[in-house]
Every structure is written in structure tokens, then in C-alpha cells.
């Protein structure tokens, strides 16, 4: 395995780990209760931490195929979630999805950075790294 692929695998894992720790920080320390769509994004992100870590330790570039699909699904989920938070015509029509509304914004840094935006960014990084790993092998 080339150093470039090794670094991409490590970067993917660190991105997933940071996203997982960030979501746990928001829910367990800041006491933000996750909405249903947040839970879906967690369900997609958390296994990536383990999958990418094992792939990195075993030097198995084939995990990039799994992380590619997980991250693609996560990108669509978080993009939809971000859209119903930020686009007025979607916000008004957003269905109730549990005790916490999916349109709620616990954070809104710089007027556009919300938790689903952070998740989307992490999924995009993992997706790009996975694509690059697949192209290198």
C-alpha cells in the first residue's frame, strides 16, 4: 500500500472519529437531544469508525468500497436534513419526526453551519477519500 493510500485511509478514519466524538459531545455533554434524522446519520457514521479503523490496521484498501457507499447514503441523509433546516419551502412542509423537530437548530455558526452541515462535510470528506483510494488500487 502506498503512503498516499495509507494517509487517505487514516484521514477517513480520523474524520469519522471526529464526527462521532462531536455528535457524542453535543448529546452527552451539551445535552442536545438528537432528532430522528440525527440518529440516522449516527447510525451511518458510527460503523464507519470501526470499519475504517480495522481497514487501516489491516492495510485493507477494500474497505474503501464500503465506506464509499456508507458515506454516500450519509451525504444524502445529511443534505436532506440540512435542507429542511435552511430552505423555507421545505421547513414549512417538514414532517414531525419525533420528540425533537428535525428543523431545530441547536447551533448555527456563521449563519449556516448546523449539526447536519457538519455531518455532511464529514461524509463528503470520507466519500472523496474513499474514491481516491479506489482509484489508486
Curated annotation (Swiss-Prot):
Annotated membrane topology: Multi-pass membrane protein
Protein name as it appears in the record: Probable disulfide formation protein C
Keywords: Cell membrane, Chaperone, Disulfide bond, Electron transport, Membrane, Oxidoreductase, Redox-active center, Transmembrane, Transmembrane helix, Transport
One BP term from GO: protein folding
SUPFAM superfamilies to which the protein is assigned, alphabetical: DsbB-like (SSF158442)
Gene: bdbC
Superkingdom classification of source: Bacteria
Disulphides: 35-38, 97-102
Gene Ontology CC annotation, any one: plasma membrane
Organism: Halalkalibacterium halodurans (strain ATCC BAA-125 / DSM 18197 / FERM 7344 / JCM 9153 / C-125) (Bacillus halodurans)
Primary role: Required for disulfide bond formation in some proteins.
Predominant cellular place of this UniProt entry's protein: membrane
Keyword Hydrolase part of the UniProt annotation: no
Pfam families: DsbB
Subcellular location: Cell membrane
